[in-house]
């Protein structure tokens, strides 16, 4: 993850000192959800992470984010984590009219918890992303799309990765908004002997109630998802419903 300090150095070196702003914003977020139906290795899912824009120069911001995804089941104990997946990303955001364009380097590393693992399971993606606020105001609509290619992978064989997401708040009820979110991730795969499967698509659709105020957001949601490669070293897809909450804060 050497891209973050390189991006910061380039921005600082190419702009007048008076125009460089350090740490213009920071964010934290938390998500917890219950699988339905619950399976032995999949009872709960948790995400926790934080991020920061390290420096802002004119319309560009160098940033870094870090997230941990934890999968909880009851294989060994009634309530025990069995997977910990680390997501690290560094890059540069740049304003492009109403949209925001991003050049990013994303790293994912997956691990068992309290279990032996000899085979490394990780990958890096270098790519671009565009986030566009199609509609603002009391009923906002936001579209995000990205395309990237792996620069390194262990075991998984991933090559191209394309992601598209729509987040909309079609109506409001008092201080709350009803929201819906849909996400599709398409991955091309170079087949490997240990993982006998080709390319795939992950899909999730969720809806619920959202409260937002001064950069703070609480979502209560229900979701349906189809997710591939849920087990670290075995190919396969997992279809499930999830019920949970998401808290985020941007300052």
Residues of each region from the PLM?
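Transmembrane beta-barrel domains of bacterial outer-membrane proteins
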Residues: 18-251
């Amino acid at each position: 993850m050497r891209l973050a300090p390189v991006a910061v150095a380039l921005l600082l070196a190419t702009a007048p000192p008076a125009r460089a702003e350090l740490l213009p914003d920071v964010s934290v977020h938390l998500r917890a959800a219950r699988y339905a139906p619950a399976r032995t290795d999949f009872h709960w899912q948790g995400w926790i992470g934080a991020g920061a824009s390290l420096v802002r120069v004119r319309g560009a911001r160098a940033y870094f984010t870090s997230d941990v995804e934890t999968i909880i089941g009851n294989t060994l104990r009634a309530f025990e984590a069995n997977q910990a997946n680390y997501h690290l990303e560094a890059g540069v955001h740049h304003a492009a009219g109403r949209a925001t364009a991003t050049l990013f380097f994303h790293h994912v590393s997956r691990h068992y918890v309290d279990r032996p693992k000899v085979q490394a399971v990780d990958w890096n993606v270098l790519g671009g992303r565009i986030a566009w606020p199609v509609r603002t105001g009391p009923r906002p609509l936001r579209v995000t799309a990205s395309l990237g290619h792996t620069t390194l992978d262990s075991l998984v064989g991933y090559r191209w990765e394309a992601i598209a997401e729509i987040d909309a708040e079609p109506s409001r009820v008092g201080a709350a908004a009803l929201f819906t979110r849909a996400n599709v991730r398409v991955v091309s795969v170079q087949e490997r002997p240990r993982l006998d499967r080709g390319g795939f698509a992950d899909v999730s659709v969720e809806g619920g109630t959202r409260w937002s105020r001064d950069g703070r957001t609480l979502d209560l949601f229900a979701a349906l998802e189809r997710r591939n490669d849920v087990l670290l070293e075995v190919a396969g897809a997992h279809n499930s419903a999830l019920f949970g909450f998401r808290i985020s804060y941007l300052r």
